[in-house]
């Protein structure tokens, strides 16, 4: 599933092509993904200018004149392809929704597994939408501080990795970047969240935004299906220190201490048992 840096990267590509332009045509190639498309989707989009974009956790919000926003989630393997309308290129398979602007931009939502979703919400009520209302703090916001994390983790006996992945606490973090952040901070993923010291929560509050910003600058991590909006792969996978590197020597403590993989809550966790305590 695309994580925060990948969604942010896609959102920026979408924004660059569509912001300030009028949606001239909407093509719905199937009536649903995870859930049915809104019955009035075409009515709310066609003929309206795109005012701005916003990312909330792993969701993209497209704000339109008329007071409505389109809410988009890419699901497990969805992607958004940006190009030019009117070309003779064959549309990709599993392209379920196409938006075109008066400037000739084209966006196609491709989702082979159909775990993504599209919905409409009044712009003034975005944060009350059922999928957004219970999300936690944004890790790239000023709210991400050591004391704030310490308060979130107070009394929580769950593993720190599970706490960081809890979208009700911190919105948008995923498996890749949590593994990387815990490694950089020397924190074992199975540690109880409530045992972290003030120094450790401060280190996490600094490392998490740094890693996310580095990943965004690299276009995200292309491991399976993910590509940027222009169809090119991201490059941050080449900078992973632990994720997907089981058996590789630890970049900190060397060949005698390879990276290990364990399973937590059904997900692979990569870490160094020597460096991370």
UniProtKB/Swiss-Prot annotation:
Any one GO biological process: base-excision repair
Alphabetized NCBIfam families for the sequence: fpg, PRK01103.1
Origin superkingdom: Bacteria
Gene3D superfamilies in the record: 1.10.8.50, MutM-like, N-terminal
Subunit relationships: Monomer.
Binding positions for DNA per the UniProt entry: 94, 113, 156
Reactions performed catalytically: Hydrolysis of DNA containing ring-opened 7-methylguanine residues, releasing 2,6-diamino-4-hydroxy-5-(N-methyl)formamidopyrimidine; 2'-deoxyribonucleotide-(2'-deoxyribose 5'-phosphate)-2'-deoxyribonucleotide-DNA = a 3'-end 2'-deoxyribonucleotide-(2,3-dehydro-2,3-deoxyribose 5'-phosphate)-DNA + a 5'-end 5'-phospho-2'-deoxyribonucleoside-DNA + H(+)
PANTHER family, per database record: FORMAMIDOPYRIMIDINE-DNA GLYCOSYLASE (PTHR22993:SF9)
Keyword Kinase: no
Co-factor requirement: Zn(2+)
Lineage: Bacteria, Pseudomonadati, Pseudomonadota, Alphaproteobacteria, Acetobacterales
Cofactor binding, note field: Binds 1 zinc ion per subunit.
Family, per entry: Belongs to the FPG family.
One GO molecular-function entry: class I DNA-(apurinic or apyrimidinic site) endonuclease activity
Signal peptide: none
Function: Involved in base excision repair of DNA damaged by oxidation or by mutagenic agents. Acts as a DNA glycosylase that recognizes and removes damaged bases. Has a preference for oxidized purines, such as 7,8-dihydro-8-oxoguanine (8-oxoG). Has AP (apurinic/apyrimidinic) lyase activity and introduces nicks in the DNA strand. Cleaves the DNA backbone by beta-delta elimination to generate a single-strand break at the site of the removed base with both 3'- and 5'-phosphates.
Protein name: Formamidopyrimidine-DNA glycosylase
SMART domains found in the cross-reference section: Fapy_DNA_glyco (SM00898), H2TH (SM01232)
Keywords: DNA damage, DNA repair, DNA-binding, Glycosidase, Hydrolase, Lyase, Metal-binding, Multifunctional enzyme, Zinc, Zinc-finger
Zinc finger (FPG-type): 241-277
EC number: 3.2.2.23, 4.2.99.18
């Amino acid at each position: 599933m695309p994580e925060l840096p990948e969604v942010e990267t896609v959102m920026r590509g979408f924004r660059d092509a569509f912001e300030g332009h009028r949606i001239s045509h909407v093509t719905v190639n199937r009536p649903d993904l995870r859930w049915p498309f809104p019955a009035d989707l075409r009515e709310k989009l066609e003929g309206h200018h795109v005012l701005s974009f916003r990312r909330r956790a792993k969701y993209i919000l497209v704000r339109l004149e008329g007071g409505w926003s389109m809410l988009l989630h890419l699901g497990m393997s969805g992607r958004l392809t940006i190009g030019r309308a009117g070309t003779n290129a064959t549309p990709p398979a599993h392209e379920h929704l196409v938006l075109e602007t008066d400037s000739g931009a084209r966006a196609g939502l491709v989702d082979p597994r159909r775990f993504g979703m599209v919905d409409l919400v009044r712009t003034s009520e975005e944060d009350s939408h059922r999928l957004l209302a219970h999300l936690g703090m944004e890790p790239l916001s000023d709210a991400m501080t050591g004391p704030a994390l310490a308060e979130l983790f107070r009394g929580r006996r769950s593993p720190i990795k599970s706490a960081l992945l809890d979208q009700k606490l911190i919105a948008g973090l995923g498996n890749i970047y949590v593994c990387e952040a815990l490694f950089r901070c020397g924190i074992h993923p199975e540690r109880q969240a409530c045992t972290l010291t003030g120094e450790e929560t401060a280190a996490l509050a600094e490392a998490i935004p740094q890693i996310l910003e580095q990943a965004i600058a690299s276009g995200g991590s292309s491991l399976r299906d993910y590509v940027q909006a222009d169809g090119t792969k991201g490059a941050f996978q080449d900078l992973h220190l632990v994720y997907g590197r089981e058996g590789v020597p630890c970049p900190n403590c060397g060949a005698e201490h390879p990276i290990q993989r364990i399973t937590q809550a059904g997900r692979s966790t990569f870490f160094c048992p020597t460096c991370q305590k």
